[in-house]
Design a protein with these regions (language model features):
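Short beta-strand/loop motifs in extracellular/secreted proteins, especially
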Residues: 56-58, 74, 127-131
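A short, polar/proline- and glycine-enriched secondary-structure boundary/capping micro-motif
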Residues: 100-107, 126-132
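Extracellular repetitive beta-rich solenoid segments
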Residues: 1-22, 51-58, 64-72, 81-85, ...
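Glycine-rich, low-complexity segments
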Residues: 12-46, 52-53, 126, 132-139
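Short beta-strand-plus-loop segments that form exposed binding edges in beta-rich domains
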Residues: 119-123
Length: 139
């Protein structure tokens, strides 16, 4: 499919898979990634999407890694409710794993129909944090 490249010669083979956002044959699935520099208690938006009455539920799988040796993986369930610009989203974190320290609390904020996934760093967490995530939407 699109974004998949396989190459090689002799005993060496390489497969490259490049993530893409929604659309195509699976519009309910998207990926994202990046990094942010933080201090404790700072909230950073790590993903946004338009919510509408057709999207009832979104599930995120999130991975965070901090330059100070902390890692975190978890799920976040986002339930959408309402219509038009009055949409509301509720979120629940679960399956939280981390070592040795939790990096952030993950939540959502809705403004003018845009749902923002946020990471609020925990006490003692500073520096560059890298994240990757996937989002699966259900209508």
């Amino acid at each position: 499919g699109s974004g998949v490249v396989a190459s090689g010669s002799g005993a060496t083979k390489t497969i490259t898979i490049a993530g893409g956002g929604g659309g195509g044959t699976n519009p309910g699935f998207s990926t994202a990634g990046g990094n942010f520099t933080v201090n404790a208690g700072v909230t950073t938006v790590i993903d946004t999407f338009n919510i509408n009455t057709n999207t009832k539920l979104s599930e995120y799988t999130v991975h965070l890694e901090n330059v100070n040796g902390n890692i975190q993986s978890q799920k976040v369930l986002v339930m959408n409710y309402g219509a038009g610009l009055g949409l509301t989203a509720y979120s629940s974190e679960y399956g939280i794993m981390f070592h040795p320290n939790q990096i952030a609390d993950i939540g959502v904020v809705v403004t003018a129909g845009i749902c923002s996934l946020t990471a609020t760093t925990k006490t003692g967490i500073t520096g560059i944090t890298t994240f990757s995530l996937t989002r699966q939407d259900q209508s």
